[in-house]
Each structure stands twice: as structure tokens, then as C-alpha cells.
């Protein structure tokens, strides 16, 4: 099958699905190997970025999705309803970062790290579809394990969890020292 026809079929699949589609599913549907399909999609991504187009293809954790470019927002909101923006407070961001880096994780583990109840924060993150239930811990009570979603990756502009920034070791040491000083101050009071 020629490349142009494969590109057209990939484009049709991504457009029609409207959500991220695993590269394996695309390859299977087109009776081609995954590496070839991935290369074709990456070439398409480069062309979409280079052309004056309103859409692009993004990669999300071994899946691909067609979406509009951010620069097109002004034109889109004139015709569509303005999407509700979710506000991520410091509490939500703190909880989300704990989940992102420590997943899968239970509410109790989040609360242990934060030092305060986190029910509201986790529930809001689930409501915003940034976090979801990924399973149950094999422990008494079988607590829910939480992890991030594709929407998390999409909203933060990262392709996979491996792309999360790594905290420099010297920063970790600084944070640890600050925490120890804070604990010591509380003990002195």
C-alpha cells in the first residue's frame, strides 16, 4: 500500500476517533507493522506542524490523537461554547504532583505525604479527569489506587510519564534540610 493512502487512512482514523488511539490498534487495522505506522505518523506530525494548518497530531504514551492547535483557540471559541477552565489550586497541584510521581498511590499515602486530608483534592482531580482509579491495593480494605490519565498528559503537554521533570539531587537535599528545620522549629515551640 502506498504511503499517501496509509496517511489518508491514519488521518481518517484519528479524526473519526476523536481521542488518543494506540499505535498498535492503528497498525493492526491497516495490516502494517507498528514501527512503520509510527514513522508515518511522526512524518505526518512534522508536516502538520510545518504547514499552516489548524490541526496537529500529538503523541500520548504510545498513542496518537488529532487535535486543534492552541493558536486556533480564538476562532474556535467564537463558534463553540467556551470550555470550562478548571482551576488548579496549590492544593490540587500538590496532590496531582504526588500522584503523578508516586502512582499508583492511595489517598492515605497522599495524605501521609501532604500531612492533611486529601479527599476533596483527589475528588476534584478525578472530576477534572486528570486522575482516575487504576486498581485496588492488595491490603486490608482494598484501598483505591490512583494514577494520572491521558488528559493529564494532554493538558500538561507531555507524551508520557517519563517526560516528567526530574528533581535535581541538590534540590532534594535542600527540601529535606528545610523540612527537618521546620520540624525542629515545631519541636522547639
From Swiss-Prot:
Superkingdom of origin: Bacteria
Pfam family membership, one: SMC_ScpB
Q: Where in the cell is it found?
A: Cytoplasm
- The reply on keyword Transferase is no
What the entry lists under SUPFAM superfamilies is as follows: Winged helix' DNA-binding domain
Keyword line: Cell cycle, Cell division, Chromosome partition, Cytoplasm
Q: Which GO terms describe its biological process?
A: cell division; chromosome separation; DNA replication
GO cellular component, as recorded: cytoplasm
Presence of the UniProt keyword Cell inner membrane in the record: no
Q: Return the similarity comment.
A: Belongs to the ScpB family.
Q: What does this protein do?
A: Participates in chromosomal partition during cell division. May act via the formation of a condensin-like complex containing Smc and ScpA that pull DNA away from mid-cell into both cell halves.
Subunit notes for this chain?
A: Homodimer. Homodimerization may be required to stabilize the binding of ScpA to the Smc head domains. Component of a cohesin-like complex composed of ScpA, ScpB and the Smc homodimer, in which ScpA and ScpB bind to the head domain of Smc. The presence of the three proteins is required for the association of the complex with DNA.
Listed name of the protein: Segregation and condensation protein B
Recorded source organism is Lachnoclostridium phytofermentans (strain ATCC 700394 / DSM 18823 / ISDg)
Q: What is the lineage of its organism?
A: Bacteria, Bacillati, Bacillota, Clostridia, Lachnospirales
